[in-house]
Amino acid sequence: MEKLTDLNYTLSVITLMNSTLHTILEDPGMAYFPYIVSVLTVLFTLHKASIPTMKIALKTSKCSYKVVKYCIVTIFNTLLKLAGYKEQITTKDEIEKQMDRVVKEMRRQLEMIDKLTTREIEQVELLKRIHDKLMIRTVDEIDMTKEINQKNVRTLEEWENGRNPYEPKEVTAAM
């Protein structure tokens, strides 16, 4: 019986909408007709969808207050979007969730900054050690024997008989 009365109610609402639309269409100067039709359609859909949804939610849910609050907030947010507002209604639960998310993100960024700072300090210490090793030390006389690998090189006076052993000798070949 409830379904039958619900059907009669729906038919009467549709009839009311049709009669309203016909009276609007008779006015030739009506420029906002598509907007009015879309708003009426959305309102009717919200009306028809919200009541059964609320009934089902209240029957199946243990926390009925939260569900009702969420449904009402969703309906108002939809109406605000239709009206062109960018602001939305939020519940305390949503605000707390967003705050927890923000705090979690801030902690993550602080940990990352701490890691990066530690790495930078380690890099600075490494660069300081490299600089200390590469530091130029002034010496009075530079020993080049290590650089050219000639520790046992003799001077002309030190050679036997004063003769250079690496000079080419005259070689005669038999023909």
Swiss-Prot record:
One of its GO terms (cellular component) is host caveola. One of its GO terms (molecular function) is metal ion binding. It is a single-pass type III membrane protein. Its main location: host cell. The chain crosses the membrane at residues 29-51. Mannosylated. Keywords: Activation of host autophagy by virus, Calcium, Enterotoxin, Glycoprotein, Host endoplasmic reticulum, Host membrane, Host-virus interaction, Ion channel, Ion transport, Membrane, Metal-binding, Secreted, Signal-anchor, Toxin, Transmembrane, Transmembrane helix, Transport, Viral ion channel, Virulence. InterPro entries: Rotavirus_NSP4. Residues 1-28 are lumenal. It is found in: Host rough endoplasmic reticulum membrane; Host membrane, Host caveola; Secreted. Glycans are attached at residues 8, 18. The keyword Transferase does not apply. Ca(2+) binds at residues 120, 123. One of its GO terms (biological process) is viral process. It comes from the Viruses. Pfam families: Rota_NSP4. Coiled coil: none annotated. A disordered 28 aa C-terminal domain is presented to the cytoplasm by each subunit of the tetrameric receptor. Binds 1 calcium ion per tetramer. Plays an essential role in the virus replication cycle by acting as a viroporin. Creates a pore in the host endoplasmic reticulum and as a consequence releases Ca(2+) in the cytoplasm of infected cell. In turn, high levels of cytoplasmic calcium trigger membrane trafficking and transport of viral ER-associated proteins to viroplasms, sites of viral genome replication and immature particle assembly. The secreted form acts as an enterotoxin that causes phospholipase C-dependent elevation of the intracellular calcium concentration in host intestinal mucosa cells. Increased concentration of intracellular calcium disrupts the cytoskeleton and the tight junctions, raising the paracellular permeability. Potentiates chloride ion secretion through a calcium ion-dependent signaling pathway, inducing age-dependent diarrhea. Homotetramer. Interacts with the immature particle in the viroplasm. Interacts with host CAV1, early and late in infection. Interacts with host integrin ITGA1/ITGB1 heterodimer. Interacts with host integrin ITGA2/ITGB1 heterodimer. Interaction with microtubules blocks trafficking to the Golgi apparatus. Belongs to the rotavirus NSP4 family. This is Non-structural glycoprotein 4. It comes from Rotavirus A (strain RVA/Cow/United Kingdom/UK/1975/G6P7[5]).
